[in-house]
Amino acid sequence: MIRISNTNMKHYHYIFTGSGLAALMTVYKMAKSGKFKEKTILLLDENQKKTNDRTWCFWQIEKGDWEPSISKKWDSALFANADFQRNLDLQPYQYNMVQGLDFYNQVFDFILHEKNISYVNQKVTDINELENHAYVATETDSYTCDTIFNSIYDKEGVENQTKYPVLQQHFIGWFIKSKEPVFNPDQATFMDFSVEQKGNTRFMYVLPTSTTEALLEYTLFSHQLLNKEEYEQEIKQYIEKLGIQNFEIIEKEKGSIPMTCYLFWNKTTKRVLNIGTAGGWTKASTGYTFKNSDKKSSQLVAFLQQDRELKEFHTKTKFWFYDLLLLNILDKHNELGARIFSSIFKKGDPTLVFKFLDEETSYFEDLQVISRCPQLLFIKAIARSMRYFLVF
């Protein structure tokens, strides 16, 4: 066993290695609860969280913790493919947009007033679990703690395994401002599959904030990322399709989110719990992260007050298997995504779909959603996935 002297190291009750969405949500809720004032908490991240580096969206019925960070809401959304368009009435849900900097400011404006919480702008280089404590090294310092919450994603480890399919939700987005009023600020474009599919699952995603301003993202659910030029060429073509001739690009963003049912929680140990994408908090079948992380962070804060073993935190549900079925299909036949999502949204109740994606539906409601999907595809996926029942 490696022995590391902690004579000159500062010790914390909790260290968060990586301070992304999941870590910040969790620490914010720990502070809000008032139950952790006697616990010292350290957040470590190489990023200062002072730029508008990403956009999150989520749906909800009632107002929640992140209301101050929401910059735009929609009661209506558009779903489209090459053959049809459908206006989706989302009520009682609202579709919400959160810009990264607004979220960071909300969290840090609160937690940095807490005497027991520290944020250090350092890159984590090593994590070690010892007999009586855990150890974290950065490029310049070392720390010890009772428990580590790690959100640094092990990309190589996940992608090198072959048991579970791994796709990516990857995209480039442009925030643009046009000279002409061309957007409907009351309606988001949830998925527009009318773009050429090219053997993949490809769609445009449009979030208008005014009649002249919108975020347009070219998004894929597939295995391989594209060259930057291909994403941007597709965005340009879509802008032309909308009839926009004069516009300026205000900001750009890009991302790649793993979509997999890999059992991240099997790596949980006595003192280290993976959270966020590294812990399987991303919704595997869609890549949505904000709502799932909101739920999981609340569950974790409640869990920590029960003095239980970290390995008891995660519980696998029926939705894990549902996600696995879709990923199994897209892994084998990536070109079928538009067909599957179109079958769900063409005539289905969008509020029931949202409830299903939130993992809040009954078995009867599950059947209402799943029965709209191409039956033969899912029967074959079930047959291919029978081996997973051994670990379900």
Q: Where are the regions a protein language model picked out?
A:
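A conserved beta-strand/loop capping segment in the N-terminal third of enzymes
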Residues: 60-121, 127-129
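FAD/FMN-dependent oxidoreductases across multiple families
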Residues: 124, 198, 222-299
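Redox-cofactor binding/interface segments in oxidoreductases and associated redox assembly factors
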Residues: 17, 149-151, 274-276
